[in-house]
């Protein structure tokens, strides 16, 4: 049999940790013949902590330079593995070192067999050592031999055997150091080979494998075809439907939900109660993000089902062929697949970009923070050079603590900022996906109209249904979101209550244990003060009491850790099983609803099914979550209380029996001892009652907090607020849309799509507002803290200039800089621990409200800008054409005047030229009037049809079976009329919107007709101008200068286009009138040379005179407007009418935020820059059979005749 020895040697730096020492740490393997267990010592840094009246914690090397270590060397030379353990204490020579007294060393030896030890062993697995005094620079060590039998531990077991050292130094408090010591058992089994057994096993295994191989081959051949065909069908079906219900059938989403729910068990069973609320807040953010993703997936699925349902209804009504429906359905599926791929790629790009940007920002701010710290340390070092070494060490320690807090604050700020950036990226992708879904639908409808697969009337009806259903979808999603927000708020409010409950239980447990242990020490001290014990006896009893108390607490910690670990696994398994079952049930129901959309006849019915299903699912899931959370808390709390009560009972038993017997052995009077025990029993009962009362009070505060949270996120209030906001925005967008003068069908379609896009992003996501609130609160707290830091720095720089507090003594002017620096640093550290002012929360709420209002206003502004831009572009195109036409008429007038004055043409010849165009002008005017009359008659017929439809359907809404003998006939009719009033109003509003849309479309059609007619007229005028320029022998350069004067705003390209048109028309005119005119000779060219030069100045003068006349008229008009009485300005702009700006839940209670309304009519008062927004109460809509009067436009043909008449006269 061989013995192996494994050795690992660690040489840690001596100056970085308290675990460094003068001798090398060695790790040997315990070995035994068979089975063989190997024990490894895992070395870790010594942690330092204080107990009792603690002033601060130590980390790394202790403040007074004391080093405490527990080390071992393993030996394998004996039958059972053994180790030589050494406890080492070194009081090193440092500037802050001091002599140590009353050293008490407590060593955990649970599971070990101790040999050759000088310590006092207890029955609970501890041994104690004492030393009266340890001088600076001295050290002492304790050694003993321990063995571990293989049957005492199992493979993989870990033994935690720390040692503790407490002592008294120059500090008024006792200091306690802890040296961790870990043993891990590994079992190595050596198997002795048996060749006969191996041969028999090989034969049996060979025969069994042969039989199984033939059986598998037989079944593979038998079912190969069936399996192949079914697999092919499954792959095809999966390829077609992988996107249809992926959000509901995917196991990843369920697994993520289960993982998030498991974290609640981790939080409740955490060993650090102080970090529970922070972990719960992070869990809430992650859950809100997951809920946003689920809602977005639900919205996408509903939108796809709605599109398919609309196409099916269109096919069933005979307005769309089944072949076209299938083709459009296939195109929609393909577009949806491409959209999902595009979104995934965009998501990956955003994540990479955001990660790189956040890393760069982190490096920059970390470097900046490091430079500030180095500058502060250098500045402090200049001050510390002139002070004692002890003060310098204390000040440096404070500065390092402050810098650590600043770094932690910076890390949290960067993490919150990165979290906000990710949430905004998710929101942008969600908005992009919604808009792209609308874009896909509208694009396919336009394509179907263009290809002739869908009639315009059917497309118009389809778009109206789509718009109406989208309003219902947005209302449904608002309900889903409000319901989810309410249920999640309720869930995490309850969880916060549970966390506070378990923290209260932990506080109660620790309080009882501390009271019981303090009573044990107090019992001994009272006897010593009464004179029944001398100092040596008291020290021995105190040592034993401290050993027993530490043993009980250590056992409690170990039992809690082990039992919580077992219970944690049990709770996770139970929770996952029930949650997975609930998710499967709800997923089947969701799939059934999605499949039923193909059989649904009405979209409202389909949306109603979704509403009921989601409400039921949310309530059931939250009920299950709450029940599981409460059950987990009850079990964990019962476990904690049972173990703590057991530990407390052991401490009482130790006091009443063990310590009592020891005191009685030393001759303590029984009556005195009994009196003290009864007093302690009463104090412990009173302490327990007081802790229970505090726990009840905290529980009541938690209940009130949960109620207030549910009140803030009430489902009905949130839904009503969102509905009111959408109604308000609907009024604004309707008002903006009605302001359009003319729109084509395509432009109207684009405007509808843009309105849908605006309404699609009017909701509030679940996670982003909360994340944004955390970022704002962190930012405001940072600003507040920096302002306080600035005050402290100013006070340190010039302390005599700062006002003194009445509660404090005035600082002495002779106080040194080091005292001021220490005081300033301590105050800054305290600021990190203090709570920020409560008004910052209200400030955050106000900022969130302002940002939301700005977002809504930005949507309104963008829509109004696009609408105004569209109208301006149309007006600009018409204006450019009018300018060109007017310039052409001006040039014609000049040419005719010069031809007449130069006697090149007689007056009758000019009349003949003008009259030659009169038949063509009259024909154009007749055609235009016929087209206008036809379109207006068509619109009147549509208005009549709409009125007849409303007259037939509107009163029918009120027609119900009546009771002939009813005594309340009138009241019944009125009640029915009131109940149906909303439907009538909606129907009337819909008909009014349709009438307005028809009006603007008709106006655009008439404008196009007039434009076409005007283009034809413009072509004729070009021919006439070309002919006149031919007669006057006008050079091209002169004509270009004339056009430049007449069209000063025209570009060179536009001028060249007019010149080319004049030249081309001149050629056409010369061909048509070949022989009618005689070519001018060189003498006539010289004759006209003189007035060619004066022509430009004459045209410029006429244009200047016209401009002056227009300016004069505009000035008089402005003066007449300013003379009118204007209403006074108001501080807040109010939209007149029954409704005003809706109240938002985040609105601050201190002051109202003025909300300007985009798209209002603004009037400049007295040219001072002040704006008066005027809103008029809309009159009640009236049903009219007449076509709305069109704006009177100037007839260009009549204007042309008048211009000619004026020119001839």
Swiss-Prot record:
Q: Where is this region: Disordered?
A: 689-714
- Principal localization reads membrane
The protein's location, in the record's own words, is:
Cell membrane; Cytoplasm, Cytoskeleton, Cilium basal body; Cell projection, Cilium; Cell projection, Cilium membrane
Where are the membrane-spanning stretches?
201-221
Q: Which UniProt keywords apply?
A: Cell membrane, Cell projection, Coiled coil, Cytoplasm, Cytoskeleton, Dwarfism, Glycoprotein, Membrane, Nucleus, Transmembrane, Transmembrane helix
- What binding partners and quaternary form does the record give? Component of the EvC complex composed of EFCAB7, IQCE, EVC2 and EVC; built from two subcomplexes, EVC2:EVC and EFCAB7:IQCE. Interacts with EVC. Interacts (via N-terminal end) with EFCAB7. Interacts (via N-terminal end) with IQCE.
Protein name, UniProt field: Limbin
The organism is Bos taurus (Bovine)
From the broadest rank down, the organism's phylogenetic lineage runs: Eukaryota, Metazoa, Chordata, Craniata, Vertebrata
Instruction: Provide the gene name from the record.
Output: EVC2
């Amino acid at each position: 049999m061989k013995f192996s020895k494994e050795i690992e040697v660690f040489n840690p730096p001596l100056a970085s940790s308290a675990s460094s020492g003068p001798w090398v740490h060695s790790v040997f393997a315990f070995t035994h013949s068979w089975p063989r267990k190997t024990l490894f010592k895992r070395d870790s840094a010594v942690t330092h902590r204080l107990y009792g009246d603690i002033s601060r914690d130590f980390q790394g090397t202790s403040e007074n330079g004391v080093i405490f270590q527990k080390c071992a060397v393993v030996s394998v030379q004996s039958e059972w593995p053994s180790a030589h353990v050494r406890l080492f204490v070194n009081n090193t020579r440092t500037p802050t070192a001091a002599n140590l007294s009353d050293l008490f060393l407590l060593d955990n030896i649970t599971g070990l067999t101790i040999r050759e030890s000088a310590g006092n062993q207890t029955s609970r697995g501890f041994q104690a050592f004492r030393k009266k005094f340890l001088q600076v620079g001295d050290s002492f060590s304790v050694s003993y031999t321990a063995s571990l039998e293989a049957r005492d531990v199992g493979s993989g077991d870990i033994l935690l055997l720390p040692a503790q050292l407490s002592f008294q130094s120059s500090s008024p408090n006792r200091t306690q150091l802890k040296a961790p010591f870990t043993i891990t058992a590994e079992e190595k089994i050596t198997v002795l080979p048996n060749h006969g057994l191996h041969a028999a096993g090989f034969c049996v295994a060979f025969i069994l494998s042969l039989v199984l191989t033939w059986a598998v081959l037989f079944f593979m051949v038998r079912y190969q075809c069936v399996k192949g065909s079914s697999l092919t069908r499954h792959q095809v079906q999966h390829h077609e439907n992988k996107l249809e219900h992926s959000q509901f059938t995917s196991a990843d989403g369920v697994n993520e939900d289960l993982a998030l729910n498991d974290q609640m068990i981790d939080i409740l069973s955490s060993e650090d109660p102080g970090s529970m609320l922070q972990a719960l807040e992070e869990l809430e953010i992650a859950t809100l993000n997951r809920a946003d993703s689920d809602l977005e997936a639900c919205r996408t699925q509903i939108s796809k089902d709605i599109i398919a349902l609309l196409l099916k209804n269109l096919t069933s009504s005979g307005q769309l062929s089944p072949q076209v429906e299938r083709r459009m359905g296939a195109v929609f599926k393909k577009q949806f697949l491409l959209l999902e791929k595009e979104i995934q790629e965009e998501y990956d790009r955003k994540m990479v970009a955001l990660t790189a940007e956040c890393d760069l920002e982190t490096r920059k701010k970390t470097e900046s923070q490091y430079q500030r710290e180095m500058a502060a340390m250098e500045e402090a070092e200049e001050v510390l050079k002139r002070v004692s070494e002890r003060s310098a060490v204390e000040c440096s320690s404070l500065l390092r603590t402050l810098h650590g807090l600043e770094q932690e604050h910076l890390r949290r700020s960067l993490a919150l900022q990165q979290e906000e950036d990710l949430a905004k990226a998710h929101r942008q992708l969600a908005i992009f996906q919604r808009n792209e879904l609308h874009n896909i639908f509208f694009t396919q409808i336009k394509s179907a109209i263009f290809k002739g697969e869908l009639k315009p009337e059917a497309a118009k009806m389809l778009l109206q249904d789509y718009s109406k259903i989208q309003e219902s979808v947005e209302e449904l999603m608002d309900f889903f979101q409000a319901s989810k927000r309410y249920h999640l708020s309720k869930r995490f409010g309850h969880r916060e209550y549970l966390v506070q409950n378990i923290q209260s239980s932990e506080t109660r447990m620790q309080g009882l244990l501390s009271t019981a242990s303090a009573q044990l020490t107090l019992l001994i001290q009272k006897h010593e003060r009464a004179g029944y014990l001398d100092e040596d006896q008291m020290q021995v009893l105190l040592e034993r009491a401290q050993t027993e108390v530490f043993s009980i607490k250590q056992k409690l910690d170990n039992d809690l850790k082990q039992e919580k670990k077992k219970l944690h696994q049990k709770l996770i398994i139970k929770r996952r099983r029930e949650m997975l079952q609930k998710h499967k049930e709800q997923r089947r129901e969701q799939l059934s609803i999605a499949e039923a959309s193909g059989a649904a006849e009405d979209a409202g019915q389909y949306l109603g099914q979704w509403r009921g299903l989601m409400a039921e699912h949310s309530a059931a899931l939250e009920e299950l979550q709450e029940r599981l959370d409460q059950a987990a808390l009850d079990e964990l709390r019962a476990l904690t209380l049972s173990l703590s009560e057991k530990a407390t009972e052991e401490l009482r038993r130790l006091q009443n029996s063990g310590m009592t017997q020891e005191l009685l052995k030393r001759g303590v009077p029984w009556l005195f001892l009994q009196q003290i025990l009864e007093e302690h029993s009463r104090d412990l009962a009173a302490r327990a009652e007081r802790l229970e009362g505090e726990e009840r009070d905290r529980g009541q505060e938690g209940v009130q907090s949960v109620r207030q949270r549910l009140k803030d996120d009430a489902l009905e209030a949130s839904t009503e607020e969102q509905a009111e906001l959408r109604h308000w925005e609907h009024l604004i967008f309707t008002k903006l849309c009605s302001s359009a003068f003319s729109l084509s069908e395509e432009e109207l379609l684009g405007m509808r799509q843009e309105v849908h896009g605006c309404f699609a992003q009017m909701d509030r996501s679940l996670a982003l507002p909360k994340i944004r609130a955390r970022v704002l609160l962190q930012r405001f707290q940072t600003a507040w803290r920096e302002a306080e830091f600035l005050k402290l720095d100013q006070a340190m720089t010039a302390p005599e200039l700062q006002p003194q507090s009445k509660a404090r003594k005035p600082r002495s002017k002779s106080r040194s800089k080091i005292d001021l620096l220490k005081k300033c640093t301590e105050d800054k550290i305290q600021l990190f621990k203090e709570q920020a002012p409560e008004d910052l929360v209200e400030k955050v709420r106000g900022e969130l409200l302002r940002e939301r209002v700005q977002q809504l206003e930005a949507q309104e502004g963008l829509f109004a800008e696009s609408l105004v831009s569209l109208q301006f572009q149309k007006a600009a195109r018409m204006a450019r054409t009018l300018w060109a036409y007017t310039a052409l008429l001006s040039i014609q007038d000049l040419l005719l005047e010069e031809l007449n004055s130069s006697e090149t043409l007689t007056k009758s010849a000019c009349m003949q030229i003008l009259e030659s165009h009169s038949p063509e002008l009259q024909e154009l005017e007749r055609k235009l009037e016929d087209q206008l009359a036809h379109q207006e008659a068509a619109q009147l017929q549509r208005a009549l049809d709409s009125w007849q439809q409303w007259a037939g359907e509107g009163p029918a809404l009120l027609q119900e079976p009546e009771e002939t003998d009813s005594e309340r006939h009138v009241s019944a009719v009125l009640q029915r009329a009131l109940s149906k009033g909303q439907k009538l109003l909606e129907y009337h509003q819909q008909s009014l919107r349709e009438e307005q849309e028809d009006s603007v479309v008709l106006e655009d059609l008439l404008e196009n007709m007039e434009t076409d007619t005007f283009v034809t007229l413009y072509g004729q005028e070009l021919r006439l101008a070309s002919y006149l320029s031919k007669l006057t022998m006008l050079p091209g350069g002169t004509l270009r200068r004339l056009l430049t004067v007449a069209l000063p705003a025209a570009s060179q390209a536009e001028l060249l286009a007019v010149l080319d048109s004049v030249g081309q028309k001149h050629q056409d005119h010369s061909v048509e009138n070949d022989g009618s005119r005689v070519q001018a000779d060189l003498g006539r060219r010289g004759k006209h040379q003189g007035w060619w030069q004066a022509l430009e100045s004459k045209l410029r003068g006429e244009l200047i005179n016209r401009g002056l006349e227009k300016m004069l008229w505009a000035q008089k008009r402005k003066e007449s407007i300013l003379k009118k009485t204007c209403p006074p300005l108001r501080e807040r702009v109010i939209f007149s009418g029954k409704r005003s700006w809706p109240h938002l839940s985040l609105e601050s209670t201190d002051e109202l935020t003025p909300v300007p309304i985009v798209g209002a009519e603004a009037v400049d008062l007295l040219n001072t820059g002040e704006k008066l927004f005027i809103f008029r109460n809309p009159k009640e809509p009236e049903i009219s059979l007449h076509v709305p009067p069109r704006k009177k436009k100037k007839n260009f043909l009549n204007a042309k005749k008048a211009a000619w008449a004026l020119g001839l006269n």
